[in-house]
From Swiss-Prot:
Pathway: Amino-acid biosynthesis; L-leucine biosynthesis; L-leucine from 3-methyl-2-oxobutanoate: step 1/4. This is 2-isopropylmalate synthase. The keyword Membrane does not apply. It comes from Shewanella baltica (strain OS223). GO terms for molecular function: 2-isopropylmalate synthase activity; acetyl-CoA C-acetyltransferase activity; manganese ion binding. SUPFAM superfamilies: 2-isopropylmalate synthase LeuA, allosteric (dimerisation) domain, Aldolase. The keyword Cytoplasm applies. It is an enzyme of class 2 (transferase).
Length: 522
């Protein structure tokens, strides 16, 4: 048996079913091209019979993708298979994936048929699909709850009439790993022609076991795993592609299995799917979460600085990230601060370590996480724990035109002790406020992240806006709190403006320090 596990991605079919709004054809094509770069073997890109839009997107992707096999879903109905075949016919290589329910509850309650009738429908569907391609996959929907005798009969019959891949889905995420492994093992033991097909699994995450069940399945002989980027999908989601890929890579010595995934594309692909699908990745998500390679504990940070593998079983570089993160918090030791200053290009002769660390702890206790620009200010601006308020928002007035969608904002800002009033228009109230603030401060920054949340509950809740902005190729993080979301957004921007102003002062000080060095060396 081959040790190669086929990765079947269904982000654009099962994954899209979880979205509040459908992706455009252009967005689906972007994701498909990212999946091709990632190296998925098969990508299931839609359900052509379901709508003209889905048909068009499947056809567009099938025409474009060359290095992955493109697949479309169909029920065990000739009209579905016809639509799939027509949409896929422009592809260099394609697969038709047809399915029917096999569990007792589905057969009796949903299909209102006998199992023998369902078996006949499945056989007919596979035969019909084989008219269009040799690559036919058949799925036993709700296999996890199907009586094993019936499941064996269905699998044997589908293989006999030409299915080259047999998918065993845990459709409702019901099974546990030992149970699911037994199902796969029983199929290998009892289905006489099982060597003529690849056994696939498609596990849902209702009980949080989709990845564990999929890994157990390949340990028992399955050689295709169906999954999605970031685990998106119906209800609690699907098996996560990035987790499967990195488990098989990280534990190759124990599992003896491999994939064709280009792991260095994982982070990039995860971000793209998250942005286009408007589904943020939770911070503690395995592999691709913001905290996956972040260390805050002083003990862990100390170990990481001595040897990276003390607390990391894989490197951030392996998934396409530049480096891990050592969060600078009140739990960080002196060695972490010294290490970070060295990474920014400073030697111990440039600053007073004792004074810096003392001020660092004060600031960390106050604000939680300390950033590079905070550290530089503490080191070179004489214990400046309090942030400069060169800019202070005095008043914000916004007017919106509901018919045109254009808003006008007027701001009054104190700039270095001088009051300035400016007005600007924008595409909505937040955009207008930002344009007015930029005009008043004459400071241009690029906002790359905007997050809206709440602090507190009920009537006492405040809107909290967190933004990340780029200024002179450095990221700055601003926070704004207010009862009004637009005002909170404006305060977050002014916060960033003050941080960039302080950064300019630090840069001037560093330049002066460098000149003094040069003069001293003459």
């Amino acid at each position: 048996m081959s040790n190669r596990v086929i990765i079947f991605d269904t982000t654009l079919r099962d994954g899209e079913q979880a979205l509040a709004a459908s992706l455009s054809v252009k967005e689906k094509l972007q994701i498909a091209m990212a999946l091709e770069r990632l190296g998925v073997d098969v990508m299931e890109v839609g359900f052509p019979v379901s709508s003209p839009g889905d048909f068009e997107s499947v056809q567009t992707i099938a025409r474009t993708i060359k290095n992955s096999r493109v697949c479309a879903l169909s029920r065990a109905l000739e009209k579905d298979i016809d639509a799939a075949a027509q949409a896929l016919s422009v592809a260099d290589q394609f697969r038709i994936h047809t399915f029917i329910s096999t569990s007792t509850i589905h057969v009796e309650s949903k299909l209102k048929r006998s199992f023998d009738q369902v078996l006949e429908m499945a056989v007919g569907a596979v035969k019909y699909a084989r008219r269009f391609t040799d690559d036919v996959e058949f799925s036993c929907e709700d296999a996890g709850r199907t009586p094993i005798d019936n499941l064996c009969r269905m699998v044997e019959a589908a293989i006999l009439v030409g299915a080259r891949t047999i998918n065993i889905p845990d459709t409702v995420g019901y099974t546990v790993p030992s149970e699911f492994g037994t199902i796969i093992q029983t199929l290998f033991n009892r289905v006489p022609n099982i060597d003529q097909a690849v056994i696939s699994v498609h596990c849902h995450d209702d009980l949080g076991l989709s990845v564990a069940n999929s890994i157990t399945a390949v340990q028992h002989g399955a050689r295709q795993i169906e999954c999605t980027i970031n685990g998106i999908g119906e209800r609690a989601g699907n098996c996560s592609l990035e987790e499967i890929a990195m488990i098989l890579a990280t534990r190759k010595g124990m599992l003896g299995l491999e994939t064709g995934i280009n792991a260095k594309e994982i982070h990039r692909t995860s971000n793209l799917v998250s942005q286009l699908c408007n589904m943020p990745v939770q911070a503690n998500k395995a592999i691709v979460g913001a905290n996956a390679f972040t260390h805050s504990s002083g003990i862990h940070q100390d170990g990481m600085l001595k040897a990276q593998n003390t607390y990391e079983i894989m490197t951030p570089e392996s998934i396409g990230l530049n480096r891990n993160n050592l969060n600078m918090t009140s739990r960080s030791g002196r060695h972490v601060i010294k290490h970070r200053m060295e990474e920014m290009g400073y030697s111990e002769h440039d600053y007073n370590m004792d004074a810096l660390y003392e001020e660092f702890l004060k600031l960390a206790d106050k604000k939680g996480q300390v950033f590079d620009y905070d550290l530089e200010a503490l080191a070179f601006m004489e214990a400046q724990a309090e942030e400069d308020n060169h800019y202070q928002l005095q008043q914000l007035v916004v007017q919106s035109d509901s018919t045109e969608g254009v808003a006008t904002a007027t701001v009054r800002i104190e700039v270095g002790g001088e009051i300035k009033t400016e007005a600007a228009t924008g595409n909505g109230p937040v955009d207008a406020a930002y344009n007015a603030i930029a005009r008043a401060t004459d400071r241009r920054i690029d906002i790359i992240s905007y997050k809206l949340g709440a602090k507190g509950v009920g009537q006492n809740a405040l809107g909290q806006v967190d933004i990340t902005a780029v200024y002179h190729e450095q990221n700055f993080h601003g926070v704004g709190l207010a009862t009004d979301v637009v005002e909170a957004s404006a305060r977050a921007l002014v916060h960033v403006m003050n941080l960039t102003c302080r950064a300019d002062k630090v840069a001037d000080y560093k330049q002066s320090m460098q000149k003094n060095r040069e003069l001293g060396g003459v």
